[in-house]
Amino acid sequence: MYLKKYQIKVVNALKQFLQTARDTKTSFDIAKQALPDNMRHTLNWVQTTFQTSSLEYKDRCTNGLGNSYPRMIIKVPTGGGKTLLAVESIREYQNLFAQKRTGLVVWIVPSETIYSQTVQKIRDKGNPLRQLLDQCSGNRTIILEKGQRLTTNDIEENLVVLFVMIQSISRTNGKEALKVFQDSGGYDSFFPADNRYDLHEQLLKQVPNLDFISPLGTEQPLIMTSLGNAIRISKPFIIIDEIHKVFSENARKTIDSLNPEFVLGFSATPKAEMNVLVTITGLELKEEEM
């Protein structure tokens, strides 16, 4: 698919950042092996990546596993082809950072109209956007929505793009808007059988921030079967359209708790505390149309 000049600018900036991030993380992971456990936290590959890339590091994120991760913003005006840029971002992330064809991408969309339009395009195997994803995955792309069955095997053998709609989050509606991650249908394969408390305890040691309950009469943990927990286990790449609408403190904590490896947001009006990777101006869009 033909990219416009400003879209090429975005993709090139993302490529450079992802390659720097991958190289830095790899070298830091090796260096950590030589350090005692109580000193390993002093090595922050994300901060070094920002410094190397000459980018401001304002939004310093830590996921639910206690690991730093990048949360980047692409500033692009409305009409700048964000869906195409999101697809290109998935391709570059898989190729340069994850370095694999499989995994989980959580694509968060802010409105019903944008949600239905985007899902329709990406589901259509004849659509150029879907074809770009299929090239990336080797024709093993699965498009899912909340409530549809998701298994560990799906993620291990395919590139799974899971669409979630979260409308604007404020202090007053935060808990209600984020209930989407409590959905409990179709995620059984991620969790041990209910009577295997030993395996539940083992999984909690690996992923300590999973939601769990302790059944009456026992102090043993029982991990909750939920979309949020399935995502936490999978350590996803998260894309957020109009990220300024889901950037309240409550929303950021929720995103952090999903244990992302990387978050990429799109916004025409990013907030001052966001990490902006690249800015596209209205003039650049206008010049492209001339």
Where are these regions (language model features)?
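RecA-like P-loop NTPase motor core of helicase/translocase proteins
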Residues: M1-M290
